[in-house]
């Protein structure tokens, strides 16, 4: 029969259990069971960093810092400066100076022009569009100056009848300018509406006269064509003045066809292109190429070759995109001329 004895203990965070057995013959056997307590074992375990590290030795060569402070160290406290207009600086080219007459804060009644009068309608009718627009903006600037001065006088509760009278005279001139411009606009619309019924006979008459001019007088013939395109189709010789619309595109096609008809008897290639076009240019891209060519046989022949190449490649401008495409062509042409200049 065996006798068992159990002993337990704890040493350095390790729990130990001893079991001793003695059999009938007196032989003693012992088993040791150990269980580590992990919570206390990890805390009490010795490591290589248990002792603090010694401080590093002081270095003899140390680079000085590149910046000692973020602030200036030579600041001085001075007496406060009282606010005054003399202490303020303003750019003399500032746009807001346009609201001041000669840089003055306010004009007195004696400094205003009390001897002027408004422009009359007959006087304005004799002025050009540029003169009317220049006069309009001069009046607008004067009214802005007067409006600022009258506003200040109302705030100071001062009388400003002289300013109000001058403002009324300038205002009268402005509405008369608008009246004259309205008259011209209506005259243009009525003339254009009347021309719509007489345009076909007029174009046939000018076309016959243009083609009948001798070859030696090409300059006079194309001067006639330039007046026609300006009066009927609104096509100006200056690119920036053109407004691309349906009338403009139709004018390009008509002028391009007339140029081909004038030079067709002098060159077989131009005549062949005119016959292939069934008597007229209908594509806006082709018309633009011929229209922008110089009024000489060599340039028109070169334009005809370019049109034939476009047709071989199948490049055509859709009718619904003609206005936008021609406007883009004009913009590129204007940019090219600016670069060349």
Swiss-Prot record:
Compositionally biased intervals (Basic residues): 48-62
InterPro entries per UniProt: MRP-L47_sf, Ribosomal_uL29_mit
Region of interest: Disordered: 44-74
Top-level taxon of the source organism: Eukaryota
Subcellular location: Mitochondrion
UniProt keyword annotations, A-Z: Mitochondrion, Ribonucleoprotein, Ribosomal protein, Transit peptide
Protein name as catalogued: Large ribosomal subunit protein uL29m
Gene: MRPL4
